[in-house]
């Protein structure tokens, strides 16, 4: 009789399934962004109409769409914009909105305050991108709304809707990180199609920046060729870049235009210039954006003939850059009554500056420890050890050999100080980087240590006085302080053809002198 076979061991249990994405997150309240990109079938219905709620819910979770879908949205929206006039005409009731600057989650709040785009007419005054870290989400969502509501939602061009600024600030980098350069180029083509101005109710001129000494009538705007990159000077540039003078309504000089020293291009226009333009064109007021406002809006001096504010600035990005601590506002105009609705900022996901990843963020800590080890290794050499092993080496001088090693120790010590400052003062470094246009600190700040960082200046003379005294433990606590620190970013960035720009500045000043005198205006 055969012996019974030994019992076989039971097979090991299958491994547990991997945890769902985000299950191991430290902050459980922050959901993991969707990894799935929306497809054409999910974004568009069978008739090719965008499902705006599906897109909105996905973007709010930091989700993305297929690149081809992003291109389709951008191109379809651009086709609608190309059919519009350079100066569109819109009717009340309407809600007018100012700068958005990539603050997508605040844009969602704006629509809560202003009303659903399905039954509310909207006019946006430009600057949808740059500075904020959700610019492409703003573009995709607004372009989908334009596709859905082409006759009730209107988009104007701001000074940031151009290649020059989006390359200099954050939008191009954001497009390349989240999508591709193809998406960025499609956005630039779409931006070239945006109208430059709107005539609201035959009463208000709506524009991003303001007036130009070369624009006297509304027909001058209508005749402009807008399908191009905005030039560094001229009427198109002025519509996007000009500002009211600081002493608007209380001018010491009656000259209408002076060189805009804050922007480094275009002009300041004053109260008499606005009143003359309004009277010549039978208008009530000019509504513009382009400047952050503590309350989200500003009403300027009233016209002596109509009793209505001659100029209104509206700004719709609350707590701009996460440091201004300002309110945002939208302007609702209905039945000849104008109402301002303010709102505060909404919570939003955090991005490190310039879309830095956590590994790059951790490098200062690693670098500090490595340099500490190198310093300790080199520092153990005694004078006796330095004297040994061939004094004839290094030009035959032991002193030269010792000096070479000491120089290495000093160099590594300098590196250690840089990494130490980066780690210990990371919050201040981030703040300074966020307030400089290139996202980079001034040369030598970190190597000089904490004291140098305290007295760091940004890249232009105009910002020096504002940022002097900025110390690492200090938090920006007022609107005016943030505006002063950020002033360098209000300038037109330097162009590759810098020589031509110098000529343009002289030409602009000469043009203002020839046509309007030489009024001097103090910049904000």
From Swiss-Prot:
InterPro entries: Calcineurin-like_PHP_ApaH, Metallo-depent_PP-like, MPP_PP2B, PP2B, Ser/Thr-sp_prot-phosphatase
Swiss-Prot/TrEMBL catalytic activity: O-phospho-L-seryl-[protein] + H2O = L-seryl-[protein] + phosphate; O-phospho-L-threonyl-[protein] + H2O = L-threonyl-[protein] + phosphate
Positions where Phosphoserine occurs in the chain: 478
Entry keyword Membrane: no
EC assignment: 3.1.3.16
A Pfam family that the UniProt record links to this protein: Metallophos
GO terms under biological process: axon extension; calcineurin-mediated signaling; calcineurin-NFAT signaling cascade; calcium-ion regulated exocytosis; dephosphorylation; heart development; learning; locomotion involved in locomotory behavior
UniProt keyword annotation of Cell inner membrane present: no
Positions of the catalytic residues: 160
This protein's UniProt keywords: Acetylation, Calmodulin-binding, Cytoplasm, Hydrolase, Iron, Metal-binding, Phosphoprotein, Protein phosphatase, Zinc
Family: Belongs to the PPP phosphatase family. PP-2B subfamily.
Role: Calcium-dependent, calmodulin-stimulated protein phosphatase which plays an essential role in the transduction of intracellular Ca(2+)-mediated signals. Dephosphorylates TFEB in response to lysosomal Ca(2+) release, resulting in TFEB nuclear translocation and stimulation of lysosomal biogenesis. Dephosphorylates and activates transcription factor NFATC1. Dephosphorylates and inactivates transcription factor ELK1. Dephosphorylates DARPP32. Negatively regulates MAP3K14/NIK signaling via inhibition of nuclear translocation of the transcription factors RELA and RELB.
Subunit structure: Forms a complex composed of a calmodulin-dependent catalytic subunit (also known as calcineurin A) and a regulatory Ca(2+)-binding subunit (also known as calcineurin B). There are three catalytic subunits, each encoded by a separate gene (PPP3CA, PPP3CB, and PPP3CC) and two regulatory subunits which are also encoded by separate genes (PPP3R1 and PPP3R2). In response to an increase in Ca(2+) intracellular levels, forms a complex composed of PPP3CB/calcineurin A, calcineurin B and calmodulin. Interacts (via calcineurin B binding domain) with regulatory subunit PPP3R1/calcineurin B.
Full protein name: Serine/threonine-protein phosphatase 2B catalytic subunit beta isoform
Originating species: Homo sapiens
Biological classification of the source: Eukaryota, Metazoa, Chordata, Craniata, Vertebrata
Gene that encodes the chain: PPP3CB
């Amino acid at each position: 009789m055969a012996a019974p076979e030994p019992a076989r061991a039971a097979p090991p249990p299958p491994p547990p399934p991997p945890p769902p994405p985000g299950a191991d997150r430290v902050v459980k309240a922050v959901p993991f962004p969707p990894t799935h990109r929306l497809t054409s079938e999910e974004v568009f219905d069978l008739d090719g109409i965008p499902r705006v709620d599906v897109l909105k819910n996905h973007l709010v979770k930091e989700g993305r769409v297929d690149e081809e879908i992003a291109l389709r949205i951008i191109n379809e929206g651009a086709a609608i914009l190309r059919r519009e006039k350079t100066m569109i005409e819109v009717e009340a009731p309407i809600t007018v909105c100012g700068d958005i600057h990539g603050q997508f989650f605040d844009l969602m709040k704006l629509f809560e305050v202003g009303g659903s785009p399905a039954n509310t007419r909207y006019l946006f005054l430009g600057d949808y991108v740059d500075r904020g870290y959700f610019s492409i989400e703003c573009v995709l969502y607004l372009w989908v709304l334009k596709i859905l509501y082409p006759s009730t939602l209107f988009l104007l061009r701001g000074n940031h809707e151009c290649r020059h600024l989006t390359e200099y600030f954050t939008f191009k980098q954001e497009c390349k990180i989240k999508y591709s350069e193809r998406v960025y180029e499609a956005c630039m083509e779409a931006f070239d199609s945006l109208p430059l101005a709107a005539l609201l109710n035959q009463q208000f001129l709506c524009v991003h920046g303001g007036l130009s000494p070369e624009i006297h009538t509304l027909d001058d705007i209508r005749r402009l060729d807008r399908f191009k990159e905005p030039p560094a000077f001229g009427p198109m540039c002025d519509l996007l870049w000009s500002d009211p003078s600081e002493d608007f309504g209380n001018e010491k000089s009656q000259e209408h235009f002076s060189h805009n020293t804050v922007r480094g291009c275009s002009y300041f226009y004053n109260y008499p210039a606005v009143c003359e333009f309004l009277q010549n064109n039978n208008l009530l007021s000019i509504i513009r954006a382009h400047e952050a406002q503590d309350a989200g809006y500003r009403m300027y001096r009233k016209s002596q003939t109509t009793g209505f504010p001659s100029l209104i600035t509206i700004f719709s990005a609350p707590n701009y850059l996460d440091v201004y601590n300002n309110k945002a506002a939208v302007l609702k105009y209905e039945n000849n009554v104008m109402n301002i609705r303010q709102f505060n900022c909404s919570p939003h996901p955090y991005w490190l500056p310039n879309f830095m990843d956590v590994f790059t963020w951790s490098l200062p800590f690693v670098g500090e420890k490595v340099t500490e080890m190198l310093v300790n290794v080199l520092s153990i050499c005694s004078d006796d050890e330095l004297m040994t092993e061939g004094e004839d080496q290094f030009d035959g001088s032991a002193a030269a050999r010792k000096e070479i090693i000491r120089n290495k120790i000093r160099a590594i010590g300098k590196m250690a100080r840089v990494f130490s400052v980066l780690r210990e003062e990371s919050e201040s470094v981030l703040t300074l980087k966020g307030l400089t246009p290139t996202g980079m600190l001034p040369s030598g700040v970190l190597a000089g240590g904490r004291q140098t960082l305290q007295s760091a200046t940004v890249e232009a003379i105009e910002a020096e006085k504002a940022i002097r005294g900025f110390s690492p433990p200090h938090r920006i606590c007022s609107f005016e302080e943030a505006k002063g620190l950020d002033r360098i970013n209000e300038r037109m960035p330097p162009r590759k053809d810098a020589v031509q720009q110098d000529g343009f500045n002289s030409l602009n000043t000469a043009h203002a002198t020839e046509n309007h005198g030489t009024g001097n205006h103090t910049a904000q």
